[in-house]
């Protein structure tokens, strides 16, 4: 949290998989998230692990920690005399838990550009590119290890980590800022906290 706040971001966007376990098990571990600070707010979209960890029970915890969870919805933020749309979608495992799956069209309907979409799984970019300016995703852990890139790409729409483009839309797939307990190792794929600087067209 200290490293993130030291960057002095205007807004903080979290692309899912924030927890592994129920609030009863992880509330103490999650407590430092309340220290995140950004003038425009802290926003998140759910990843698959939020659903495995009882997302309905986590929603009030996220709110209490100052994190706005966007589930097929958007926030239109005033920025320097203009607007910025920040949207988030649910994950495609939601249906297994009787919850709505990702619906980027609903999330973005009626919102102004520029639009940033948080979608935990990057393959949604194939569908969303015409409607957005930037998509931020995770899920792949950056491939975990360099030699796993091809396999990770196969199961994630061809995306592994870094920048991708389709026409005027851009996708960034982040490797995440920590480790996953199921494979607590990184080989040549360091974790990161990404600082993006958005510039208006001249």
Protein language model features and the residues they cover:
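Soluble catalytic domains of enzymes that build or remodel membrane lipids, polysaccharides, and related
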Residues: 1-202
